[in-house]
Amino acid sequence: MTIKVGINGMGRIGRMVIRAIIESKNKNIEIKHINNRSNSEASCTLIKYDSVHGKFDADLDFDKNHLIINKNKITFSQESEIKNINWKKFNVDYVFECTGKFNSKEKLLSHIKNGARKVIVSAPVSYTHLTLPTILLV
């Protein structure tokens, strides 16, 4: 079964998620959609050239609505609000929330309402009545 993922936010962590998935060469994980505030051209450049990790060894290209990584066309959008991202339309099951902006249950539920089955959050999440542990996956 292929795990179909989307990435919201392409800061340091979002870009590292992309690199990790591509470099793993795991055929069971497929990036279906990326949402980032900057355009696809700038996002492509940021993935390709990293000041810490160096040049990404992948074939990267873009058009207005896609990032193309190793000939795989990934849909791309520039939405500021989760409520405007239709994960179901992009066939996404799991969303990596990497903006750091949406860190409460109320805000994150928009991903689920828009079609994602699960959300993996890269920043601590605040709940009004619960303290949740932060889990580091290495």
Which residues does each PLM region occupy?
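N-terminal Rossmann-fold NAD(P) dinucleotide-binding loop
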Residues: 14-15
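Glycine-rich phosphate-binding loop and adjoining beta1-alpha1-beta2 segment
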Residues: 31-69
